[in-house]
Amino acid sequence: MHLHIPDGVLPPLAWAPALAVALVLLVLSARVRAGGTRLQVAYQSALGALTLAAMAVEIPLGPLEYHLTLVGPLGVLLGPAAAFRVLFVVNAILAMLGHGGFTVVGLNALVLGAGAALARPAYTALVRRFSPGTSLALGTALAQVVSGALWLGVVGYALRAGASAPASRLGLVASLAFPMWLIGIAVESVVAAGIGRFLARVRPDLLPVRRGGMAGAAEEAA
């Protein structure tokens, strides 16, 4: 889930430390593959463009709006470090387009990056027993659960930090966000299952671990 919070809403105590941590992680993640090939850079850029397109399209769900994040597939295909770099850049571009303020770029990168970081370990543990499509769907579900929980925590903190915000607003937001969270988990998992099945048939080398424990070429993109 993505934070669409404009600048000036969150107190600096909420977004400034998150932005500092995100920048540190961005530098550290860049050193993981400092000597990446042009093909790896192009691969990460292509997945980043796909993620940006998915996150820019909003799907109305009653009083709220939802958009795909592709956090699960992104984390599985790129790994934690590369996925975090891509998510940071994507969120910065979305902020320029008005999808959330610049002050929440760090928070969004951390919220989505946490889910992406868990997606690949979950996938590699599951793919030895299940099909790539099922494994990618389950890894995506875990990523969405983690990102959604962090999203709700940030929103709850923002409401509590507002001096004029009534206490009942947190319950209202939770009652609206929880069904959307469940729908988002289901939708993202279905999309991830389709991506996993497609790649298993057409480009199995892009998956990090093939069935039987063989390493895939996607591990080189991390």
PLM features: what roles do these ranges have?
Residues 17-24, 113-122, 183-197:
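Hydrophobic cores of alpha-helical transmembrane segments in multi-pass inner/ER membrane proteins
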Residues 48-52, 82-95:
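Small-polar-interrupted transmembrane alpha-helices in polytopic inner-membrane proteins
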Residues 2-73:
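Hydrophobic transmembrane alpha-helices
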Residues 28, 108-152:
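Short helix-perturbing small/polar motifs within transmembrane alpha-helices
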Residues 16, 41-46, 69, 84-88, ...:
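Hydrophobic alpha-helical transmembrane segments
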Residues 134-148, 164-222:
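C-terminal transmembrane helix-loop-helix hairpin of multi-pass membrane proteins
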Residues 56-63, 89-119:
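Interfacial aromatic-anchored transmembrane helix boundaries in multi-pass membrane proteins
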Residues 152-164:
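Membrane-helix interface motif
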